[in-house]
Amino acid sequence: MKAFDLHRMAFDKVPFDFLGEVALRSLYTFVLVFLFLKMTGRRGVRQMSLFEVLIILTLGSAAGDVAFYDDVPMVPVLIVFITLALLYRLVMWLMAHSEKLEDLLEGKPVVIIEDGELAWSKLNNSNMTEFEFFMELRLRGVEQLGQVRLAILETNGQISVYFFEDDKVKPGLLILPSDCTQRYKVVPESADYACIRCSEIIHMKAGEKQLCPRCANPEWTKASRAKRVT
C-alpha cells in the first residue's frame, strides 16, 4: 500500500458508477429522516427532547450505513424507520397518560432564578454552565438578575424568562462579561454588593472583606439597579 495515495484515499476500490448509487441512497435516507421530523412536528433540534434526540441518533446511524455501504440493503432501514416511528407514537401516548414516565424520559423543568436570585446549586447540577446561562439571559436583554422574576431551564435546554415590572426591579448581580465588570475581595465603598457565584446581595462598608454567607465565595461586584430598556 502506498501512503498518501490520493486515488486510494478518495475512492479505494469503489467503482465510479457506484457513486450514483450513493447519491440515490443518500436521497432515500434523507427523505426518511425528513419524514420522521415532520411527523414529530418539531421545527428545529432545540425543540427536541432527550428522547427524541435519541430516536434521531438511532435513525441517523441506520441511515448512514445504508447511504454508502454497498452491502447494506435499503429495505431494512425502512423497517427501522417504521419501528422507530411506532415506538415514538407509543411512548408519546404513554407519556400523555403517565407523568412519572414523562419525567423519566423528558426530565423536569428547573427553576434557575427566582425573585432575582440565582439557584446556583441547581444550575451546577444541570448541563449548563454559568457562562452559557448568562449568555442566554443577555440575548434576552437581561443586564442584571434583579430584573428577572423567574427563569426556568426547560427540558429541551431552552430558557423561559419572566420579568419584573420596572417599579419592582431589585438590585442584582450584573451578568455582563467579566471584562465589563469589576470584582472585589475588599470593597472600595459602602454599597450593596452581589456575590459573583450565587448572586447573594448584602450591604458592605468601605474596606470590608468577607465570604458570602450563602456559598462562601470571597469575590463581589457592585449590585446593579439597572432596569430593562424595552
Swiss-Prot record:
InterPro entries in the cross-refs: DUF421, UPF0702_alpha/beta_dom_sf
Alphabetical UniProt keywords: Cell membrane, Membrane, Transmembrane, Transmembrane helix
Subcellular localization: Cell membrane
Residue runs in coiled coils: none
Transmembrane segments: 16-36, 48-68, 75-95
Topology term for the membrane: Multi-pass membrane protein
Listed Gene3D superfamilies: bsu07140 like domains (3.30.240.20)
Domain of life of the native organism: Bacteria
Pfam families given in the database record: DUF421 (PF04239)
GO CC list: plasma membrane
UniProt keyword Isomerase, yes or no: no
Keyword Cell membrane assigned: yes
Record-stated family: Belongs to the UPF0702 family.
Designated name of the protein: UPF0702 transmembrane protein YcaP
Species whose genome carries this gene: Escherichia coli (strain K12)
